[in-house]
Amino acid sequence: MILFLTSCSEVENTDTVVTNEVETDENESLESRAKRHVEASLTIPVNEKYSLKIYRANLDGDDREDAIITVNRYDFAIEEALKSNNTAKRAEVGYMGNYNYIFYYDGALNKISPPQVISSTPQAELTVKFDNITSQVYQDILIDYRIRNSSYKAIYSIRNHTPKRIFHWKNFDGLGTEQKEAYVLKFGEGTAGIQKDIYILKADFDNPESAEDLFTYSPDLRPTKEVLHHFFFVSSTDMYMTKK
């Protein structure tokens, strides 16, 4: 039996940025702390407009609420494009770059992690959902991000107080073209452990009829019954794999 690690047509797009830890005030709200931490970690000037959102859940199995903090720097992406010699080209590719970030707040430690950058198209902010995939005690993190007219889903699980990506796959591609493709993830009972198996179903969607922004438009995906791939969790690698 040959096992294959999960893969996607895109290159690895997540990196951790090493930063100095920001001093904390025990009585300060998470919203206020997150703002200070984000601005210090990413060296965001006071006059920059950016988006910061906080998504709360139990992500590591203790009795404290944790959180994922997302940051989108679309205005900064435009500013950098205007300063470059390739403004039109950057706009054409959707200002693709390092402008979407996630931070992890550990409720038990009461600390916010360094940022992880998710290279993507900044017109679309990251979308975050939670689900019990690798455990019934805590939830894992599902993040959707855009690369031009395509969309991808990454699944993270907390390891050593840090989000670790354990799976990723394409949601759709070719939006607005005849070469469109789409997939839907379905979770089922684990065959190799308590962690749920992942089934990739072929799906379809309708292209927008009007002049929608293809970098932000989210079509409704219609899954079929056709299973293209079946992944299961391998504890020794801490990743999802498939037989082939």
Residue ranges of model-derived segments:
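Terminal domain-start segments
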Residues: 8-120, 237, 241-244
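Beta-propeller blade termini
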Residues: 51-59, 124-134, 138, 179-191
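Acidic/hydrophobic-patterned starts of short beta strands in beta-sheet-rich repeat architectures
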Residues: 59-71, 132-145, 191-201
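Short coil/turn segments at the loop-to-beta-strand junctions that recur within blades
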Residues: 119-126, 170-175
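Acidic, small-residue rich beta-repeat scaffolds with periodic aromatic anchors
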Residues: 2-49, 146-244
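Alpha-helix initiation and capping sites
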Residues: 96, 135, 146-150
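"Short basic amphipathic alpha-helical interaction patches in structured regions
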Residues: 70, 82-86, 144, 154-159
